[in-house]
């Protein structure tokens, strides 16, 4: 066994056990708290550093002892509440701590305090040692409250909740802290010893030079610690609210409660139970016998839990139990007189102070305490949370509930469902009645009893359910089969029920928010008879009253109809006779307990006769102040209401007055009403906000700003204040930033320049974008720099005064000293240079310069007027037309072809701002701009003249050079002639020399010379010739290449000539010598041949070289260009060829499409100049399509796929596994308005198995389909619930559960075309051909014989119809009468068809464009009423039709309600005359030429805003579109069809005043419904109109309709005018008189319907500000023409804004783009209901389930006689001729929803075997019976049976629904939030077989 303990696994488990033990964890956290070194260590370290000797040792010991004792008290105070409260009181800390620390500081500064060191015999009597002990003790106690406790110290408090044995954890943590403290002190001692013994310190030169330095430092240590202590005190004094200096806020009176007078003021009993620490929460499982009780007068602003005890005087006692945390420490500061409850005694003494005693006990204390510590004052920087529903700010206090143990599933578990006051009071009562309890139940017994009770209830419910199913199997349709709805009855005999809203047993539309019973237990019947009102039982009764569930359950007979009917509540409210005796004892206990609470010496008869408890209500904790900010104060002043001064500090801003209108002087603006006060001035001001961080952030005056969080600034000027935790998220750190973008840009720029030729155009665009981005970054940097400079001037003290004075000085110097001096100097210089002076021109420019005084942000005022408070707020000086000194003035006309951008750039210099240094800048605080230099034009002129002189000199030099060339040429010719003459003379001399042979050798040299000259002359001629050829053929003589070629040619010729000379000389020598020597002639001839051949060879080489050199450069260029062209052509041809292929394929597809849709092409509307409306055109096509489909029954007839959803097509394509996307590649890649070839898509779906129809089987297409059966069955089941897909605002219009009753009535009674979709006939019968493979069959047929293949086809066909229902709904969109594109064997007669078409269109105008069936549920009675349902809507839909109508409007007067029958009825909408004239709503479109002008039907309201001009949308090929209207409808497809355009929101209420003249209203067709009529009026009207023929009731005359529509508009205006008065009376105390209708319209619009943001356009905002700046200047000028023209040229003034009229309507403002409407989310009242029904809508049992069971609002009113009549009526509505028991389709529906959920929940609770058999035992054992019920009903299809067997009895189907409704059943609470997940216990996962 010993060896086994050393196994690694056992060692690890042992190690983990030791580590996770309470002792080790306590030691660890206690050791960590040692590291939380705070200011409490100051005294301890000072004793270590300063004290020496025997007394120093004693002081060190006393300091350590006091420090440890203080820390021990802190640990004890965590669990000892009185000590914690005493240490944590704000009074104690503020009054005692700071004076003590300040006193200690001044005491320590006494000179002889630390100097006297007399030894004493009893050291503990020494005052200094005692003070050291007390200092360390007290400062340690203050550490957690007045000084900051670090996070490490709080870990002990945080971890306390995780330990079961609290005291053991505290002890171990203290021991750990002690160990850590000892180690820390030892380490400090070692450091001191090391410092004293270190040789380096001793040998230091400074210390050796001053040997008394160490002793002086030791003596001054006391002062150093005193200074540190003083700094700490001052710092934390700033963080504690000053009791005297804080601002006193003006409180407002609380709303008085009804029936409560001053005598009946509530007495508040408070139990303060606080934990020590910032987030310490006191658990109620601790010993509360030592809780501190205290009381004070009622504070109506605090959260109270009222235990109201009814009596004669109705005295109210409120018990309030507060848990105060560190976060809310300074909020509430009540004064308490404490008294203790002795928990060991049998009776407690609860001392309650009387008001008479309060008067003389608190008259001295209360004013002082209120002055020092006002709990209602905003001393701490708290947020003021505004709420429209609650006037005052809500206190940020503790939650209403907290974690407490409660019984759940028979076990005690922690639940977040308990108010702390109730938990504390219940625990107190438990301690008081402990001796009454004979025995205590253990947890196992509790669980066994609970499980037994749960099993018993489950068995009873199961038996009841089985019996009901068996009775169904016997076909006994007794009323007892269906469980009736239980009503809560007040009187059994008279059948008086509670109101439906407050009936806890009702659901659906009558479900209300009430507080149900907190426990199933109740008191006895005798007590119930005494009290007429039912008493609500709370958790206290669960402690006092116990009931034997065994006996209680036996009294309930689950199969007894009487117990399930109206008497059911009596069985729950009665007890058996055997228990009455026991209950008497409990009533005594009740009397004893509540007498404790109620007894008061002044009032002994509070509650003696009967004992009862009312509900525990909660009062919202609020502050007693209603604070306003600056904006609200100004709004109140504008509305002429008396407003208080604002208490909330807004962002730092300054009010800059830009215009002051003195009405005494301005006669044009004088009003007769305001003429009483002649000195009244009207100021126009702008608010200038500071650009720095908002350190105020809505802080309240008087609160301590030092306690604000997140007030750290990282930069000098930044937009927002950052938290220290977010510093790492800053883009650029301050110290470690290195911008490498500049070097990279330079490198990239150089690289671009080097490789310019190889770059393409894309890179050029990127380069431009980079340049633009660089410009933007530069602009941002400059703007940031300007903001920093402006804020620096604004933040420094007296900076604005200095800057303003300097600017004024600079302005005067510039205008009157500097510029005139420069003008004088310039003109004198011109006279000295013999130029004409320009005095007049310069003085004119100088006079034109204007120095305009501006506000700090640049708003122009005037030249003479200074801004208001300019010395403190700042000033700018703007220079208009700044003077620039020019050396001369020239009058040149600007050429017309000049670049306008350059002109604009030149005009930027028309104004500038003056800086402090006298410089000019473009923007305030910007960088100085470069001035135009005075000498720059002079230098330019000099440069021009120098350039001209250089040009002339160059021409002269060129001529001289040519002359020299001619001279050289002439000299060369002369030299040549002389040379030839000499040669001739030499020849003569040579001839003469032959006579005399003596001078032989002398005559040979001249001869040689002559031959050489001759050859040289010839060679020179050839060289000159070649050079001339090269020069003549060259294209660029002065290019570098030609120069190289010439040089090379000359060099080559020179070398060749030299070779020839040498050869010729040798030849001559040889020849001359051979004549003398007589050599052989053969050898000489051979050499001559060699020389001649070499000469020819070199000549050829020379010519070829010359030619090659001359052509090489052009050859290279041509070769490169050829390569480039080939590559470019190849690249261009690639997309061209691909485009051709694509166009050819597209052309083929379009031809096929046109060929397949020839019938559709003929029906495309041709646009003319008439007006048509899209509904009439669509319906014309629909009727023609339906006629074609009837004629072509046996042909291939498809409908136009006019509204196929792109999203759905892509979804189906993605879901299909065997599809090839190559065919749809062009469509998938096209992002615009995709021209779907919808017939091909449909065919492709059928071929690939995505959709199935008759055509698939008709053509014998049998392809294998790959499906995931399980997933697709689940998807199919979900998709079959399409009818629950309500639109959002209609869900919110409906009440909770209303769709089960009222909506379904509309659905079944009026809309017959939709039941055709949902009924078995139209869903399953799709025009079967009478063939062998697919015979005509009906679900009404009881038996059918098909072979296996036919059965497979039929089941497969039906199944895939369920899968592809959405596909058919989209593809076969236009045939509204049938979801398929084919006819049906069962066709209704024409009259019925017309009638239901008529009613469908009249009631369901929303379905004209979108085909969601649930839209047809609502009639005209269900139109959203904007007046009453704004608060119920999750989104404020400002496009709702009747957004400002008080009365509901019949949509028939607005919407086209005419339809065309197949053959007989041909009513066409044509009466659009009145609408086309009223441009308020409509736009003109083109009308169908084929429409009949004789038949007219009603006016048409453009509710979609789609009647725009077709010509405004260019369509090059209309044949590619299905209808012209759908081009316009494409954008509306993205918008929900229940909305109207934004332009209709801005309804011009005053635009149609003239319409209501001379109008004859047709009372028979009045479109206004009275407001007191019910919603069923639509149902009644519809039923009446169904009986009328279509031809009679469906058509009215033009005059009636015109008058009707005009009456609607006139009534709207009347309603609007009435709404003006109502809104003014409600929202204004003093009614404001409107000066114009526009103002009234805007005010009414903003007040009643401003649920969205009206914001300005950003660019418009800047333009308006610029205009305002110019206006302020122009209003002060006498002759503003010049300034106006220059402002317009500079772009400062925008003429578009000047065109905005004063009386523009909202519609026109919207049209101009001035106002932009943004919808805003609203707080929703019924948000929980919306989420609930959205969640469980897909989990409802079947789409036909609601058609019968929830048609009737009260099922208990159904009797047996009307049962079959009800079924027959239902069948008639669903167009089924046999009896159809839809409600019995699911056997579980027999039970009521509450019992249904209860049965499932109880089955799941008892599923001990995890395989799921036990929980479904009831259902699994009775599946056969269910099957029998289903098989006997032959009309039910097999798919439904399979669906039941597979899905209906599985637990996961209902899990979400059960969780959604769990609050109502399991917890017996109905607080309106059925998704409060903190109260729902999630069940364990159950296995699904």
Curated annotation (Swiss-Prot):
UniProt keyword annotations, A-Z: Chloroplast, Membrane, Plastid, Plastid inner membrane, Protein transport, Transmembrane, Transmembrane helix, Transport
Sequence segments annotated as region (Disordered): 255-303, 1610-1633
InterPro entries to which the protein is assigned, alphabetical: TIC214
Transmembrane segments: 11-31, 67-87, 88-108, 127-147, 175-195, 224-244
Keyword field contains Membrane: yes
UniProt topology in membrane: Multi-pass membrane protein
Localization (cell): Plastid, Chloroplast inner membrane
Biased composition (Acidic residues): 255-265
Primary site of residence: plastid
Biased composition (Polar residues): 279-293
Gene Ontology biological process terms, A to Z: protein transport
Pfam families per the UniProt record, alphabetical: Ycf1
GO cellular component terms given for this protein: chloroplast inner membrane
Subunit record text: Part of the Tic complex.
Family membership noted in the UniProt record: Belongs to the TIC214 family.
Function: Involved in protein precursor import into chloroplasts. May be part of an intermediate translocation complex acting as a protein-conducting channel at the inner envelope.
Protein name: Protein TIC 214
Gene source species: Gossypium barbadense
Phylogenetic lineage: Eukaryota, Viridiplantae, Streptophyta, Embryophyta, Tracheophyta
């Amino acid at each position: 066994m010993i060896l086994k303990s050393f196994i690694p696994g056992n060692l690890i488990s042992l190690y983990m056990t030791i580590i996770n033990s309470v002792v080790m964890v306590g030691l660890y956290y206690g050791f960590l708290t040692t590291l939380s070194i705070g200011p409490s260590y100051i005294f301890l370290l000072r004793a270590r550093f300063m004290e020496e000797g025997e007394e120093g040792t004693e002081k060190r010991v006393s300091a350590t002892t006091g420090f440890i004792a203080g820390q021990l008290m802190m640990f004890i105070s965590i669990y000892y509440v009185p000590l914690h409260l005493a240490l944590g009181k704000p009074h104690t800390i503020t009054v005692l701590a700071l004076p003590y620390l300040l006193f200690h500081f001044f005491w320590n500064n006494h000179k002889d305090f630390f100097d006297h060191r007399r030894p004493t015999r009893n050291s503990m009597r020494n005052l200094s040692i005692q003070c050291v002990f007390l200092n360390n003790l007290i400062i340690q106690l203050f550490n957690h409250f007045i000084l900051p406790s670090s996070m490490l110290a709080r870990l002990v408090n945080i971890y306390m909740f995780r330990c079961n044995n609290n005291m053991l954890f505290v002890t171990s943590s203290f021991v750990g802290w002690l160990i850590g403290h000892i180690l820390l002190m030892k380490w400090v001692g070692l450091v001191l010893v090391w410092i004293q013994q270190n040789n380096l310190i001793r040998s230091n030169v400074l210390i050796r030079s001053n040997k008394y330095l160490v002793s002086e430092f030791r003596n001054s240590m006391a002062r150093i610690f005193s200074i540190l202590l003083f700094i700490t005190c001052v710092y934390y004094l700033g963080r504690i609210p000053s009791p005297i200096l804080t601002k006193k806020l003006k409180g407002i009176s609380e709303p008085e409660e009804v029936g409560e007078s001053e005598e009946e003021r509530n007495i508040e009993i408070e139990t303060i139970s606080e934990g020590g620490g910032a987030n310490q929460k006191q658990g109620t499982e601790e010993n509360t016998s030592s809780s501190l009780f205290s009381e004070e007068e009622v504070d109506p602003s605090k959260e109270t839990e009222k235990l109201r005890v009814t009596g004669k005087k109705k005295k109210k006692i409120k018990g309030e139990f507060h848990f105060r945390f560190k976060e809310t420490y300074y909020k509430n500061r009540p004064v308490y007189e404490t008294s203790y409850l002795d928990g060991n005694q049998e009776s407690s003494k609860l001392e309650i102070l009387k008001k008479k005693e309060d008067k003389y006990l608190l008259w001295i204390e209360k004013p002082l305490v209120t002055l020092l510590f006002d709990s209602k004052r905003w001393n701490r920087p708290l947020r003021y949370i505004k709420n429209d529903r609650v006037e005052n700010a809500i206190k940020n206090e503790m939650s209403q509930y907290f974690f407490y143990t409660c019984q759940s599933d028979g076990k005690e578990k922690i639940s977040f469902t308990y108010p702390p006051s109730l938990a504390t009071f219940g625990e107190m009562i438990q301690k008081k009645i402990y001796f009454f309890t004979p025995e205590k139940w253990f947890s196992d017994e509790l669980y066994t009893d609970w499980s037994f009770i749960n099993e018993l209830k489950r068995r009873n419910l199961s038996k009841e359910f089985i019996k009901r199913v068996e009775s169904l199997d016997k076909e006994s349709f007794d009323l007892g089969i269906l469980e009736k709805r239980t009503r809560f009855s007040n009187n059994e005999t008279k059948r008086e029920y509670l109101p439906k809203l407050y009936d806890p047993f009702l659901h659906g539309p009558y479900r209300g928010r009430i507080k149900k019973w907190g426990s199933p237990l109740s008191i006895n019947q005798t007590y119930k008879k005494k009290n007429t009102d039912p008493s609500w039982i709370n958790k206290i009764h669960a402690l006092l009253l116990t009931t034997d569930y065994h006996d209680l359950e036996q009294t309930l007979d689950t199969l007894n109809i009487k117990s399930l009917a109206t008497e059911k509540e009596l069985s729950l409210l009665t007890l058996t006779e055997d228990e009455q005796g026991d209950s008497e004892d409990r009533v005594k206990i009740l009397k004893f307990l509540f007498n404790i609470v109620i007894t008061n010496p002044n009032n002994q008869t509070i509650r003696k006769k009967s004992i009862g408890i009312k509900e525990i209500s909660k009062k919202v904790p609020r502050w007693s102040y209603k604070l306003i900010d600056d904006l609200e104060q100004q709004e109140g002043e504008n509305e002429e209401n008396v407003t208080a001064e604002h208490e909330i500090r807004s962002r730092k801003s300054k009010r800059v007055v830009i215009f002051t209108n003195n009405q005494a002087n301005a006669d044009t603006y004088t009003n007769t009403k305001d003429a009483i006060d002649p000195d009244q001035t009207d100021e126009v001001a702008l608010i200038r906000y500071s650009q720095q961080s908002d350190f105020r952030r809505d802080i309240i005056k008087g609160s301590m700003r030092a306690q604000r969080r997140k007030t750290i600034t990282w930069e000098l000027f930044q937009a927002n204040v950052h938290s220290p935790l977010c510093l790492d998220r800053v883009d650029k750190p301050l110290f470690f930033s290195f911008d490498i973008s500049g070097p990279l840009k330079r490198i990239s720029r150089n690289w671009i320049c080097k490789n310019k030729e190889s770059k393409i155009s894309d890179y050029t665009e990127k380069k431009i974008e980079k340049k633009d981005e660089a410009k933007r970054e530069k602009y941002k940097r400059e703007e940031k720099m300007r903001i920093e400079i402006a804020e620096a001037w604004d933040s420094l003290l007296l900076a604005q005064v200095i800057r303003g004075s300097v600017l004024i000085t600079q302005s005067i110097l510039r205008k009157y000293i500097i510029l005139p001096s420069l003008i004088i100097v310039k003109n004198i210089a011109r006279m000295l240079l013999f130029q004409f002076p320009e005095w007049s021109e310069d003085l004119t420019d100088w006079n034109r310069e204007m120095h305009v005084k501006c506000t700090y942000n640049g708003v122009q005022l005037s030249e003479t007027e200074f801004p208001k408070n300019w010395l403190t707020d700042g000033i700018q000086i703007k220079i208009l037309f700044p003077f620039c000194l020019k050396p001369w003035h020239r009058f040149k006309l600007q050429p017309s072809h000049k670049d306008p951008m350059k002109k604009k750039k030149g005009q930027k210099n028309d104004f500038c701002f003056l800086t402090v240094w006298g410089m000019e800048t473009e923007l305030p605080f910007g960088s100085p701009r470069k001035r135009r230099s005075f000498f720059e034009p002079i230098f330019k002129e000099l440069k021009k003249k120098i350039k001209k002189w250089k040009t002339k000199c160059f021409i002269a030099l060129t001529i001289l050079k040519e002359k020299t060339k001619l001279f050289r040429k002439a000299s060369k010719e002369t030299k040549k002639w002389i040379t030839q003459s000499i040669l001739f003379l030499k020849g003569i001399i040579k001839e003469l020399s032959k006579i005399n042979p003596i001078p032989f050798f002398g005559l040979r040299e001249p001869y040689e010379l002559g031959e050489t000259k001759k050859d040289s002359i010839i060679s020179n001629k050839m060289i000159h010739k070649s050079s001339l050829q090269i020069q003549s053929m060259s294209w660029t003589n002065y290019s570098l290449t030609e120069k190289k070629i010439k040089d090379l040619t000359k060099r080559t010729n020179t070398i060749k000539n030299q070779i020839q000379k040498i050869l010729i000389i040798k030849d001559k020598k040889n020849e001359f010598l051979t004549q003398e020597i007589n050599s052989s002639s053969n050898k000489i001839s051979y050499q001559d041949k060699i020389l001649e051949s070499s000469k020819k060879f070199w000549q050829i080489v020379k010519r070829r070289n010359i030619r090659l050199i001359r052509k090489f450069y052009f050859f290279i260029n041509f070769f490169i260009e050829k390569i480039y062209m080939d590559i470019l052509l190849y690249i261009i041809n690639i997309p061209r060829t691909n485009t051709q292929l694509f166009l050819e394929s597209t052309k083929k597809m379009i031809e096929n499409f046109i060929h397949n849709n020839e019938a559709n092409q003929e029906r495309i509307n041709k646009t003319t100049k008439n007006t048509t409306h899209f509904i009439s055109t669509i319906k014309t096509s629909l009727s023609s399509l339906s006629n074609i489909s009837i004629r072509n029954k046996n042909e291939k007839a498809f409908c136009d796929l006019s509204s196929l959803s792109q999203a759905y097509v892509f979804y189906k394509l993605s879901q299909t596994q065997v599809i090839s996307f190559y065919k749809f590649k062009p469509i998938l890649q096209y992002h615009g308005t995709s021209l779907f070839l919808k017939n091909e898509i449909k065919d492709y779906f059928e071929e690939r198995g995505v959709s199935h129809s008759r055509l698939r089987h008709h053509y014998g297409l049998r392809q294998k389909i790959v499906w995931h059966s399980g997933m697709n069955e689940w998807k199919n089941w979900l998709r079959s619930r399409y009818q629950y897909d309500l639109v959002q605002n209609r869900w919110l219009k409906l009440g909770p559960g209303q769709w089960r009753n009222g909506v379904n009535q509309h659905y079944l009674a009026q809309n017959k075309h939709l039941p055709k979709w949902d009924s078995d006939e139209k869903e399953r019968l799709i025009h079967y051909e009478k063939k062998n493979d697919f015979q005509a069959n009906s679900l009404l047929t009881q038996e059918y014989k098909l072979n296996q293949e036919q059965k497979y086809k039929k089941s497969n066909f039906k199944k895939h119809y369920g899968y592809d229902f959405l596909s058919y709904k989209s593809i076969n969109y236009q045939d509204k009468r049938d979801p398929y594109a084919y006819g049906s064997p069962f066709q209704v007669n024409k009259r019925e068809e017309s009638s239901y078409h008529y009613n469908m269109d009249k009631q369901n105008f929303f379905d004209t464009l979108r085909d969601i069936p649930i839209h047809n549920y609502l009639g005209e009675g269900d139109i959203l009423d904007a007046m009453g349902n704004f608060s119920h809507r999750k989104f404020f839909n400002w496009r709702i039709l009747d957004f400002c109508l008080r009365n509901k409007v019949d949509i028939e007067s607005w919407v086209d309600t005419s339809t065309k029958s197949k053959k007989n009825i041909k009513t066409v909408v044509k009466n659009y005359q009145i609408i086309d004239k009223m441009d308020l709503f409509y736009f003109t479109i083109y009308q169908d030429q084929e429409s009949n002008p004789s038949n007219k039907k009603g006016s048409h309201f453009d509710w979609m805003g789609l009647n725009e001009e077709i010509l405004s949308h260019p369509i090059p090929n209309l044949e590619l579109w299905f209808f012209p209207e759908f081009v316009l409808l494409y954008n509306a497809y993205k918008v929900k069809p229940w909305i109207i355009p934004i332009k209709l929101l801005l309804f011009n209420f005053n635009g149609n005043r003239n319409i209501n003249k001379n109008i004859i209203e047709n009372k028979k067709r009045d479109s206004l419904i009275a407001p007191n009529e019910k919603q069923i009026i639509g149902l009644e009207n519809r039923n009446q109109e169904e009986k009328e023929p279509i031809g009679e009731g469906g058509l009215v005359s033009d005059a009636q309709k015109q008058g009707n529509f005009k009456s609607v508009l006139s009534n709207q205006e009347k309603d609007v005018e009435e709404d003006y008065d109502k809104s003014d009376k409600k929202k204004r105390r003093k009614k404001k008189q409107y000066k114009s209708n526009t103002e009234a319209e805007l005010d009414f619009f903003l007040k009643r319907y401003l649920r969205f943001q009206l914001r300005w356009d950003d660019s418009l905002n800047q333009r308006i500000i610029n205009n305002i700046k110019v206006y302020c200047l122009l209003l002060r000028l006498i002759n503003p023409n010049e300034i106006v023209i220059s402002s317009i040229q500079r772009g400062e003034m925008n003429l578009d804004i000047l065109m905005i009229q004063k009386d523009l309507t909202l519609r026109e403002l919207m049209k101009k783009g001035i106002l932009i409407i943004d919808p805003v989310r609203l707080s929703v009242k019924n948000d929980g209901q919306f989420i609930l029904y959205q969640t469980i809508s897909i989990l409802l049992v079947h789409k036909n389930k609601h058609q019968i069971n929830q048609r009737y609002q009260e099922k208990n009113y159904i009797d047996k006689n009307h049962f079959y009549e009800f079924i027959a009526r239902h069948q008639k509505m669903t167009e089924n001729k046999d009896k159809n028991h839809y409600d019995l389709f699911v056997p579980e529906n027999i039970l009521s929803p509450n019992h249904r959920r209860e049965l499932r929940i109880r089955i799941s609770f008892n599923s001990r075997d995890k395989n799921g058999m036990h929980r479904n035992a009831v259902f699994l054992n009775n599946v056969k019976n269910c099957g029998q019920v289903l098989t006997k009903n032959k009309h039910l299809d097999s798919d439904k049976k399979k669906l039941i067997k597979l899905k209906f009895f599985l637990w996961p189907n209902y899990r979400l629904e059960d969780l959604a409704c769990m609050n109502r059943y399991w917890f017996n609470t109905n607080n309106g939030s059925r998704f409060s997940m903190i109260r729902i216990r999630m069940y364990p996962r159950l296995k699904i077989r």
